[in-house]
Amino acid sequence: MEKKKGISMAVIKRLPKYHRYLQELMENDVDRISSKELSEKIGFTASQIRQDLNCFGDFGQQGYGYNVKELYNNIGSILGLTRDYNTVIIGAGNIGQAIANYNSFNRLGFKLKGIFDANPRMFGIKIRDVEIQDVEKLKDFVKENDIEIGIICVPRTNAQKVCNDLVEGGIKGIWNFAPIDLEVPKDIRVENVHLSESMMTLVYLLNHNDVK
């Protein structure tokens, strides 16, 4: 199973949704499913699903459909969920704590190794057995513990400094919840989650009916 060159980001962003729905099917003891049945559950067309999956190999069988468990495992492999990723959270406020307590975090392979904050009153407090540390220790911690992913949950004014420390420590990917577009080297991957932008999109949809 080899990924073809030139896979669009739109395809990549649909894979986690396939993975999530396939997990639900397995939990409901569904062994196989057609692209048509999958399209009815997910909301994409059957043709779109087939095209997306064909970017990575031949998974279905004519007249049979897809083996749910096999497809789930294959998509997990494509997404890189076959190994663990050492992860840190920066910002132990509401968002940071919610992410640290997210039940699927560990199951998906994201191993929380450290939580950092600038507030001295937070130092030493544990969240899921991980002690909150001084953010000034972040760069060295990333270097010494082979941290690959940093999750930024700090205010906009502090986010770029945190990002710089992560990059200097050798981070490979950043999940950014701060309302800022971070400046990073080209080889650092950043996935932004701008909550206010998502809310503004929702407000638009509430007030307009012109979206296809």
Swiss-Prot record:
GO molecular function: DNA binding; DNA-binding transcription factor activity
Residues bound to NAD(+): 91-96
UniProt keyword annotations, A-Z: Cytoplasm, DNA-binding, NAD, Repressor, Transcription, Transcription regulation
This protein's record includes keyword Transit peptide: no
Subcellular location: Cytoplasm
Superkingdom as given in the UniProt entry: Bacteria
DNA-binding region location: 17-56
Function: Modulates transcription in response to changes in cellular NADH/NAD(+) redox state.
Family: Belongs to the transcriptional regulatory Rex family.
PANTHER family, alphabetized: REDOX-SENSING TRANSCRIPTIONAL REPRESSOR REX, REDOX-SENSING TRANSCRIPTIONAL REPRESSOR REX 1
Name by which UniProt lists this protein: Redox-sensing transcriptional repressor Rex
Provenance organism: Clostridium perfringens (strain 13 / Type A)
Encoding gene (name): rex
